[in-house]
Amino acid sequence: MAMYTTMAILTLTSLIPPITATLINPNKKNLYPHYVKMTIASTFMISLFPTMMFMCTDQETIISNWHWTATQTLELSLSFKLDYFSMMFIPIALFVTWSIMEFSLWYMHSDPNINQFFKYLLIFLTTMLILVTANNLFQLFIGWEGVGIMSFLLIGWWHAREEANTAAIQAILYNRIGDIGFILALAWFLLHTNSWEPQQMILLNSNPNFLPLAGLLLAARGKSAQLGLHPWLPSAMEGPTPVSALLHSSTMVVAGVFLLIRFHPLTENNQLIQTLTLCLGAITTLFTAICALTQNDIKKIVAFSTSSQLGLMVVTIGINQPYLAFLHICTHAFFKAMLFMCSGSIIHNLNNEQDIRKMGGLFKTLPLTSTSLTIGSLALTGMPFLTGFYSKDLIIETANMSYTNAWALSTTLIATSLTSAYSTRMILLTLTNRPRFPTLTNINENNPTLLNPIKRLTIGSLLAGFLIINSIPPTSPSQTTIPLYLKLTALSITLLGFLTAFDLHLLTNKLKMKNPSHTFHFSNMLGFYPNTIHRTIPYASLTMSQNLASLLLDLAWLEKLMPKTISHHQISASVTISSQKGMIKLYSLSLLIPLSLTLLLIM
């Protein structure tokens, strides 16, 4: 047990030396990115041992405590919770980050601040691991805020771009709204349970009030970009592609879902919270899938697919299946990171072109990238025996057998079908037909720092689901029988989406849309939500504030009440009691006229 705990803690502490090295020796050499990459690779190897020991010994939870500080009413300690969720997530996050770091060596090679970029990515990963292993709300809040501030720094990495700065501010502001809910839950639990440790909170109050649970749901809504607080996620594509890959695969966006998974014992008996969670996830996964259908930016298509999959995870929590939601987090990390890296490879080779309408024919010039992009897209749609199939098929199957409402189930099924539709559209426009980019574009796919990480994640997208599904705890009692049509539901709607998208592409790829329909505008403009929230409401607020200021301050206060009114009354009284009118100009003129006439007569 001691050896197991020591190796698990060693995994976490192994990431600290590269961070502190930059403080001790600011004059870093060019080898620092390679040092960070090798550190993460070795840490991944180390993390496999405690994970395998945990799975083989059938441990449930191991908690390590170190006393930190104490107040009159609360004792705080550094508490690490090593359970199935944390032990499974750590090696997956390290493996994905290792691949992203190696990809960054190729993608960011010309950036003058590449060392700082690698340090930021490493801190980003470290704060996420702190969040995953935290056993009290205060420690979890440190990791929560850590991933928030690091996302702000990394999204706005190219700070000379106005769009990048705007996207970074959007991310931090929307997450501030979610943090209000987190702090509200912190305060409520401290007031009513006098503890921030989940075990004690569950024992003392197994069915808490609606208020803290709503706070946790609001926090997850902001961090995992659920409907209402979602616009920051597609805007975050203004950051470098490695940032997008890490942000969407195994760090920030899954933090909100992980929070709901961690505190699921508190929410599972509250029917109102479960219903709100289910409906929020269902409408998010459908809305973002609709938005992805008409996007032309390849990174935004992948970003909206992330938001749609996050909605599916929230739906899974809403039907009381946290282990299935966690399984989808693990499988999703592999193919989502690979999709972003394939997108980055295409963008980099096409001189920063991101419009899929200006691509085409890339399966000949970028064979590995094209193959990996196709595998990742198929895994995203849940094609059989790819990584995404093992989690997505189980989620649809469980939703069919659960006591959920028909609206949420239908919405989720439609979104699943749309996932295959926009994935097919992206593949057809990007990889097939003739090239629609300048023929003199220099395309090169021979760099090993590009090929190796994509190959690793491709293998993960093929095999990881099979390996993870065999180690997940039972999610429900074994079913003796299940109707065939329920078993084939996920596959049927996926194939329906494929066929529909392929048929529409063949029918319309030669047509020009002179007058786009209202439906197209709704999807392409993201439901007009950003325009409404970022333009209409601020403009109305500023106009109202300006009118109130001018009417209340200028007209009412200055004109009608105090300064001008007092001045007017004093002038009237002065004129009444004094014969001198104070007309200095007239007096001077009356003095000058006789003087002028006298001078004229003399002359």
From Swiss-Prot:
Q: Name one Pfam family in it.
A: Proton_antipo_N
Q: Does the keyword Translocase apply?
A: yes
The entry's cellular-component GO terms read: mitochondrial inner membrane
Write out the transmembrane intervals.
4-24, 36-56, 87-107, 114-134, 137-157, 171-191, 200-220, 241-261, 272-292, 301-320, 325-347, 366-386, 407-429, 457-477, 482-502, 583-603
The signal peptide annotation in the UniProt record is none
Q: Looking at the keywords, is Translocase present?
A: yes
Gene Ontology biological process terms, A to Z:
electron transport coupled proton transport; mitochondrial electron transport, NADH to ubiquinone; mitochondrial respiratory chain complex I assembly
> How does the protein associate with the membrane?
Multi-pass membrane protein
- At the top level, the lineage of the source is Eukaryota
Q: What is its main location?
A: mitochondrion
Concerning its family, UniProt says: Belongs to the complex I subunit 5 family.
Q: What's this protein's function?
A: Core subunit of the mitochondrial membrane respiratory chain NADH dehydrogenase (Complex I) which catalyzes electron transfer from NADH through the respiratory chain, using ubiquinone as an electron acceptor. Essential for the catalytic activity and assembly of complex I.
> Quaternary state and partners of this protein?
Core subunit of respiratory chain NADH dehydrogenase (Complex I) which is composed of 45 different subunits.
Protein name per its UniProtKB record: NADH-ubiquinone oxidoreductase chain 5
Question: Which organism is the protein's source?
Answer: Hylobates lar (Lar gibbon)
This protein's gene is called MT-ND5
